[in-house]
Amino acid sequence: MTRCLVVGKPNVGKTLFSLRFAFFLGAEAIRLARAGQEREWASVDEAVRELVSDRPHQTLELQRLVLDIRGRKGSRRFELVDTGGLTDDIPASPEVRQAQVDTLGLLFQSKFLLHMLDASAVGRPGAPEAPGEVDVQLYHFGRARGRYLLLANKMDLEGALEGWREARRRFPGVPMVAVSAVTGQGFKEVRRHLQRHL
């Protein structure tokens, strides 16, 4: 099955995006596989309440959603994988380090990469969510291999538009979509991009 990996720093909105995008694609219930077990929530809101947090490193295991995306050639099934946040430094926690190892291990095994930034933090150097060296490395990796889309998330927050412009300047030559995991902004563009490349 084709795999699409959602990567980025902690607290940029990867889990919320993954859950809401699954709903946008027509998933009525959220069925998620993680740590070798499958779990189901009756609604995306239930899953969001349990899985999304303002705390960094809430996602410590790869979370796999099997979804269908409709295109001109019919419907295609793919796996959307929500990952633990990657950091510029080595985390003290062994659980967080393992989550990062798991994420990096899937980079080369995934057909498509969705790299998420917090657009509202782009212009705030020193903010934990601000783009850092790990984002630069993901950008270069994605640009070199193709099948890569940069997502500037949190466009519903103050400062995000300026952050979007700055991200376009810092990360040139790759497709970028302004999204909001909260409002659904940009989901149609992401879907179109995936339809073309999956």
Model-derived regions: residue spans:
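Short, conserved catalytic or interaction motifs in soluble domains
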Residues: 30, 92, 119
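Charged, alpha-helix-enriched surfaces in structured cytosolic catalytic cores
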Residues: 12, 16, 95-98, 184-185, ...
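A conditional alpha-helix N-cap/helix-loop micro-motif detector
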Residues: 58, 93-96, 130-131
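Conserved G1/Walker A P-loop phosphate-binding module
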Residues: 1-88
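Catalytic P-loop NTPase motifs of RecA-like helicase/translocase cores
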Residues: 13, 87-88, 123, 158-159, ...
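Canonical P-loop GTPase G-domain recognition
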Residues: 156-198
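Conserved C-terminal guanine-recognition region of P-loop GTPase G domains, centered on the G4
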Residues: 99-174
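Helical mechanochemical/support elements of P-loop NTPase systems and associated helical scaffolds
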Residues: 58-61, 76-79, 99, 160-163, ...
